[in-house]
A protein has these predicted regions:
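Serine-esterase "nucleophile elbow" of acetyl-processing enzymes
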Residues: 1-42, 48-53, 66-70, 76, ...
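Alpha-helical cap/lid subdomain in secreted, periplasmic
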Residues: 25, 33, 57-204
Length: 219
């Protein structure tokens, strides 16, 4: 459950990466046919902030019905926060983390069974992302807040005994738009998420078995 970097938005603005490129699809390939990855990426999605210019981007409004649509799930992967750094929201990293907590709590309330949780702190916004010719919705303060998210998200993960991954340690934003993952970033992130899930013990009882099982993972 994420934003444009889960959707697979291309940095050059020409649409969406194909299923051979998106990290969600590569993760599906890593897990194989015995497991099912559910893609829930939406461009512009935030944790709790309503965007007056783009309808339906508030993750808190969508997570409940999304969980109900796909119940039962075994693992929820959350990667949100980049759009919360936009200047019009004027949010600190602590505020964004509090928004993430609200999303998690609502997901728990709407789930038909307990699920494991993996929190991913998103890649950093690139230097100069708000410069002329790039994305005017961000500025230098946005860049700084994006760099502070990992510290706050790690605290949230610890509170929920959840898995945690700092995507900024794995990939950089494309130089084309200073905001979105490129092909190599998607590949690196898919491998890192797979490793985190398998090596941290998330879904361990379902992954290390001799017969395939249905594994629903909302990403």
């Amino acid at each position: 459950f994420g934003d444009s970097n889960t959707y697979g938005y291309r940095p050059d603005g020409t649409g969406r990466f194909d299923e051979k490129t998106r990290w969600t699809c590569l993760l599906q390939k890593n897990f194989g046919n015995g497991h099912r990855i559910i893609e829930e990426g939406l461009c512009g999605r935030t944790t709790i902030f309503s965007d007056a210019f783009r309808e339906g981007r508030r993750g808190l409004d969508q997570i409940g019905i999304t969980i109900e649509t796909h119940n039962p799930i075994d693992l929820l992967v959350l990667m949100l926060g980049t759009n919360d750094c936009k200047t019009r929201f004027n949010a600190s990293s602590k505020t964004i983390a509090k928004g993430l907590i609200q999303v998690i709590e609502k997901a728990k309330n709407y789930s038909s069974q307990p699920f494991e949780l993996l929190i991913i702190s998103p890649i950093h916004l690139g230097n100069g992302v708000g410069d002329d010719g790039f994305d005017p919705e961000f500025d230098l303060a946005s860049e700084q807040v994006s760099r502070q998210l990992a510290q706050e998200y790690r605290k949230v993960a610890t509170h929920y005994h959840a898995g945690f991954l700092d995507a900024s340690k794995i990939a950089l934003p494309s130089e084309i738009d200073r905001e979105h993952l490129d092909e190599s970033g998607h590949a690196a992130l898919a491998d890192a998420i797979y490793k985190t899930i398998t090596e941290s013990g998330l879904l361990l009882s379902l992954i290390h078995i001799s017969e395939p099982t249905r594994l629903d993972v909302i990403s």
